[in-house]
């Protein structure tokens, strides 16, 4: 399975797609840290691993803390000339894409960047995405639907669309391929499960193909100011009451 997953990207992208690009990879305790490193190196990138740990480090693309943000900024300062900082969450199905300035880009917007590169016939993504994504897809004449939160709803929407090139993603950045996608160097077979590597690779490759920076790549989206996080030690009784009050059949 490991070799097949690595080959998936090696066969779809050029071996020099990221040639000359210095990419800092925050490895922490992510289970896919070695696989992601190999994939990026196979595409020609110079990968600089940092922060490797054998102790679990909780990091979540939907709960990027002020400490996380400071760390990304520090990495950008410590590695002048870097192209990007990337990472995943602990089980490596949620991507982190941080530009050359140390700025983290949310998963809903990352999904739009990937979709711009794939040029699908249909997109499905969570209702919690910000409306800059809607605006951009409408400008590109890409049909889309909002789904309930969770990959099963996105998978169902892709299947029901009947589109030749159907894709989807979650606000955490995990990307799903509902159909085969041809690339300049090969193809990506359907993978209707949350994938962190595809959005990382496509964002980097797309910027490289356009000879631009990651920060400029994301500037195609209408500026929006959004944030998400977790409220710690919130009483279960109160959370259940909120869910019951907001539930709709």
Annotated model-derived regions:
Residues 1-58:
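Gly/Ser-rich phosphate-binding catalytic loop and adjacent alpha/beta segment
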Residues 2-14, 68-71, 146-152:
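Active-site glycine-rich loop that binds ribose-phosphate moieties when present
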Residues 13-18, 76-80, 88-89, 96-97, ...:
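Solvent-exposed alpha-helices and their adjacent loops that cap or buttress functional pockets
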Residues 23, 68-73, 86, 91, ...:
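Buried hydrophobic positions in well-ordered alpha/beta secondary-structure cores of metabolic enzymes
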Residues 34-39, 59-63, 95-101, 117, ...:
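Short acidic, glycine/serine/threonine-rich loops at helix termini
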Residues 36-100:
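N-terminal small/polar loop signature for handling phosphorylated ligands or for N-terminal nucleophile
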Residues 45, 49-51, 103-121, 186-202:
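Gly/Ser/Thr-rich active-site loops/lids in small-molecule metabolic enzymes
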Residues 82-84, 120-249:
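Phosphate-binding and adjacent anionic-ligand microenvironments
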């Amino acid at each position: 399975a490991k070799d097949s997953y690595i080959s998936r990207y090696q066969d779809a992208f050029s071996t020099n797609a990221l040639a000359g690009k210095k990419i800092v990879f925050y490895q922490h305790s992510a289970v896919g840290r070695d696989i992601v490193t190999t994939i990026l190196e196979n595409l020609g990138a110079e990968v600089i691993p940092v922060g490797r740990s054998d102790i679990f480090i909780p990091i979540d693309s939907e709960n990027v803390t002020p400490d996380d943000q400071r760390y990304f900024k520090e990495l950008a300062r410590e590695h002048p000339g870097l192209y990007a900082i990337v990472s995943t969450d602990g089980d490596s199905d949620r991507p982190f894409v941080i530009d050359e300035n140390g700025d983290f880009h949310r998963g809903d917007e990352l999904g739009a960047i990937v979709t711009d590169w794939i040029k699908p016939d249909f997109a499905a993504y969570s209702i919690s995405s910000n409306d800059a994504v809607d605006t951009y897809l409408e400008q590109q004449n890409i049909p889309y639907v909002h789904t309930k939160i969770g990959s099963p709803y996105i998978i169902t929407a892709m299947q029901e669309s009947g589109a030749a090139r159907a894709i989807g993603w979650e606000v955490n950045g995990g990307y799903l391929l509902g159909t085969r996608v041809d690339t300049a160097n090969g193809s990506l077979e359907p993978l209707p499960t949350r994938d962190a590597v595809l959005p990382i690779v496509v964002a980097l490759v797309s910027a490289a193909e356009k000879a631009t920076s990651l920060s400029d790549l994301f500037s195609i989206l209408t500026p929006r100011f959004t944030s998400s996080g977790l409220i710690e030690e919130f009483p279960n009784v109160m959370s259940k009451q909120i869910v019951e009050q907001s539930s709709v059949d």
